[in-house]
Amino acid sequence: MGRMHSPTFDGRHTRFVLTAFFVRQIMALAGFALLATIALGIAALATWNVADPSLSYATGNQPTNLLGYSGAIFADIVMQFLGLSAIIAFLPIIAWAIALIAGRKFNRIPARLVAWVAGAIVCAASLGCFPAPVTWPLPNGIGGVIGDMILRFPALFIGAYPTGTIATILGVIFAAPAAWLMLFAAGIVGGLDDELEREEAVPVATSKARAAREAEEDDEDDGEGFFANMLAFGAIAHYWYITQARLRRLFGLKSKSLHTEFEHPYDFNEYEFGTLNEPSRLKTAINRLDQRSEPSFEERAASRRQMSPPSIALDHDNNADDEPPFDADGRRLPNGILSDDESDDKFTPRQAPGRGQPRITAPSARPKPSERVAREAQASFIAADGFQLPTVHLLAEPKNVVRDNTLSEEVLEQNARLLEGVLEDFGVKGEIIHVRPGPVVTLYELEPAPGIKSSRVIGLADDIARSMSAIAARVAVVPGRNAIGIELPNQTRETVFLRELVGSRDFENSKAKLAMALGKTIGGEPVIADLAKMPHLLVAGTTGSGKSVAINTMILSLIYRMSPEQCRLIMIDPKMLELSIYDGIPHLLSPVVTDPKKAVVALKWTVREMEERYKKMSKIGVRNIDGFNSRVQQALDKGEILTRTVQTGFDRQTGEAMYETEEFDLKPLPYIVVIIDEMADLMMVAGKDIEGAVQRLAQMARAAGIHVIMATQRPSVDVITGTIKANFPTRISFQVTSKIDSRTILGEQGAEQLLGMGDMLYMAGGGRIQRVHGPFVSDNEVEEIVAYLKTQGSPEYLEAITEEEDEDGAGSGPAGAGNFSDSEDPYDQAVAVVLRDGKASTSYVQRRLGIGYNRAASLIERMEQEGIIGPANHAGKREILVPTEADIIER
């Protein structure tokens, strides 16, 4: 009788089965690891950007690659050497990973590796034969450096790199061996297990007899392989459960989740009725779920479902509802778990905003760089014609600022709860529904309880700042929402740089005519405003609040998008410090005006230019500057000449109407932006003239393409008058010293709570106020940009902007003094007054003509220069050197 072998305890084949099982699992894990590595490589290639920092291109920009610096370096190396053939080189590796996962073995592994390398090289040569597209950013071909190197060998025979038909033929010739090598490397050609099966065929045939004899000796070993496999799986499962139990005991974990415990707290059988009468277990689970609960209000309690502790009623009520009640999540519970009657132990579940919809909003990412940044990163050796806009690389790169740990979700959640407690201490009930961290401040949106006035919460700004240990706190109503925004400064403030705004896609793709990068919102989104729609801007703030830096950023924003043919600038800087650095750039219509007297003349010239533009537009029949330029451009493209036929009179002999054809000057009109850095100084010197000119420009200059940016550091009512405020609907307020100044600029308080250094409140035309953090630009950056602009061309100044009109009225002599009063020139009228009345003083001319003191003084000085009156004596009186009207009458 043969010996019996137990499949459970016989280990003859058990070790072999376990070894094969573990080898199979290791191969599968290796396949998955290889597949994950391929996915990372493909992700790095898919997000490859030529402007990312790499071994061949050094820059401080943040890498846009999905894998960061390592992905950018990997993608750059692969694309530089292999080009687009790198994508094809990944295909055999994917086949290897799939084969490993399926448990298939490889034969001739060294040969397949060599075939893979050779196939990648030949594929690069094949792609290098084809011309690169226009958008290809690398200097070599689409086959990379390797493809160009291989193409040098045909160049030795034909004398140059192959192009045209020869290149296409070579590409097709190279494609055939490249495809075969890749298929062989992937195992598609030659098979993976063919030779292994042939090599194992002979040993298998010779062992059939021995296997038959062994089968005859042990007939009961037929199912041994099955039991061995079961033994292997059983051993693995056994050790897995042991390890899992040890981990639970080590870390104090429980087998059932809290959610399962709350859903099915008890098993309803005859042995657990005594346990059901004890509601402590359910209360404990509910309390754990309610650890993060927000304050609830009495008004909301009626609309929420109420849940009572579980109690099992052994005596069922016949009048009970047939349908069992539901819990707070809508699940049907057994009868008796929820009581229909209210009890003392009843509680109301309060849903925290973090459940389902988290109230902590993730900070916004940096603005995505535009195509302009990548385009300017590649140096061009071909000189461009015409005016070239300044490159973004002239601006300072934004620093890599690490997010402050105070902006983590735990800290923000703790601050939200602390703020709720502070408000409750002051008698304000509410809950923080959203927390929006930003680069400078964090916005906490408070949803007040019904009956709480917003003015009451706004008045607690100083108390909130004191209780939260903050420098300042701004409280305002969030437009369009039932929420009050509480803005608290961050401990670590991030600097907003102009480069990340000018180089962003939002700025490049903006459809604004006169786009200006104002800064970032509280959440970190870029703010791009259109000066053409404002149409004028009033900027106010104390010294050191960032007002001058903001003016520089506005000017640079216009310069980075507009050429001198599209936009011209008139700069008025009575302080002679801020805008004088721009003197000499091609965009200027006149040198930077620093004399207040010439500033008045420049504004009056702007008014006359506005009127001339309106005349031109009315003749052509358009309504604004865009329509005028469009009509002119259409005529230039078609080679036409715009004409207009007007009636000039009637023929005396025939009485027929006479017409004349008038031709127009076909020249597009540029936008004109007038920038006044300090309005207070101009108002002190010539307040009446300045206010009148600014009023006319603000009321009428929008359609003519003339816009005014006016800044002042003294936002008082004598500088920002009611007339100016009525014509400047768009305003920006930086930090001010008092609530009165804030109300003067914006019509409400809040600007006194700003942090300075570019922190502003931006009020658009509709009256909506938005907090914006202005970008920073240094003097060195401005100087570099100005130096670059000066190399692009010299400015074409108009002398008439700063020169007063001279109507040759004084040359007619004293004999014509009686006709001076009929002239419209103020100088002629002043001479007529002096010669008629015999009094030559500034105050007398001012009083008689109704003009400003400075204007009258300039007229008196001009009379002295032309010899009509003499210089003032020690008493301030002047002698009239020409005969007066009284002298002429006596003669």
Swiss-Prot record:
Residues 289-302 have a biased composition (Basic and acidic residues). It is found in: Cell inner membrane. GO terms for biological process: cell division; chromosome segregation. ATP binds at residues 544-549. Coiled coil: none annotated. Residues 524-743 form the FtsK domain. Gene3D superfamilies: 3.30.980.40, P-loop containing nucleotide triphosphate hydrolases, Winged helix-like DNA-binding domain superfamily/Winged helix DNA-binding domain. GO terms for molecular function: ATP binding; ATP hydrolysis activity; DNA binding. It is a multi-pass membrane protein. The keyword Plastid does not apply. Keywords: ATP-binding, Cell cycle, Cell division, Cell inner membrane, Cell membrane, Chromosome partition, DNA-binding, Membrane, Nucleotide-binding, Transmembrane, Transmembrane helix. It comes from the Bacteria. One of its GO terms (cellular component) is plasma membrane. Residues 286-373, 804-824 are annotated as: Disordered. Residues 246-891 are cytoplasmic. Essential cell division protein that coordinates cell division and chromosome segregation. The N-terminus is involved in assembly of the cell-division machinery. The C-terminus functions as a DNA motor that moves dsDNA in an ATP-dependent manner towards the dif recombination site, which is located within the replication terminus region. Translocation stops specifically at Xer-dif sites, where FtsK interacts with the Xer recombinase, allowing activation of chromosome unlinking by recombination. FtsK orienting polar sequences (KOPS) guide the direction of DNA translocation. Consists of an N-terminal domain, which is sufficient for the localization to the septal ring and is required for cell division, followed by a linker domain, and a C-terminal domain, which forms the translocation motor involved in chromosome segregation. The C-terminal domain can be further subdivided into alpha, beta and gamma subdomains. The alpha and beta subdomains multimerise to produce a hexameric ring, contain the nucleotide binding motif and form the DNA pump. PANTHER family: DNA TRANSLOCASE FTSK (PTHR22683:SF41), SPORULATION PROTEIN RELATED (PTHR22683). This is DNA translocase FtsK.
